[in-house]
Amino acid sequence: MTKICDFDDKMNYSGDYSTTGYARLEKSLIDIVKEQQAKLGYRKEIVRLYYPLSTLRHFFECAGADNKIAAGMISEQQMLEILDPNNLPKQLTDTIGEINVTAKNERFCIEIPPEGSEYVHENTADNEFISELIALVGTHGCTMEQITELFYKYSDNIEKKDMQNGEFDCYIRFLNEPDDTYYYCFHDEGCHIIYHRFLPQDYADFGF
């Protein structure tokens, strides 16, 4: 079997867990659950999140690094093996819980148990920026100027660029903020502004 993990004992990492694909996946799951809880409120219930294979590949691949599969080479079946319950590290299951993963046509469903939702609610700091952004875009008459001001409230070092792809009008992102590397893409639908956020690798894949 091809080695797919940085450590021989995947249940008890002896190295730096924070550099692993599992840690990157865990952060993404927690970020999305936080965002959902800010939008909809907290309930101790199962949460199902969907990822394309390409996004999961970005978490687990690092071209040229030891013990990694070359970029673009992890198949759907290999990813299911990586995310098999028997391969999940204790560091992940102690936080987000015993996730269940299924896949079809390179689209993955990651099912987070109620305990994972509870952990995010009770043991992670609130994301004040996301909460304010959600409240702002939900306000009638919200403008891009107000949204830009909100970004500047949290950092003087941001980037804002127009987008000409017909789907979004512009993106804003924080620079030099390692905990928030997302591209926040906005579209003015006339009556309100919507946003989606993308990790840098996914943004590059889309070719916006």
Predicted regions mapped to residue ranges:
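Positively charged, polyanion-binding regions of nucleic-acid-associated proteins
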Residues: 8-49, 59, 135
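Alpha-helix boundary/N-cap detector
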Residues: 13-28, 51, 74, 87, ...
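Charged low-complexity interaction tracts in eukaryotic proteins
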Residues: 7-20, 81-124, 166-170, 174-177, ...
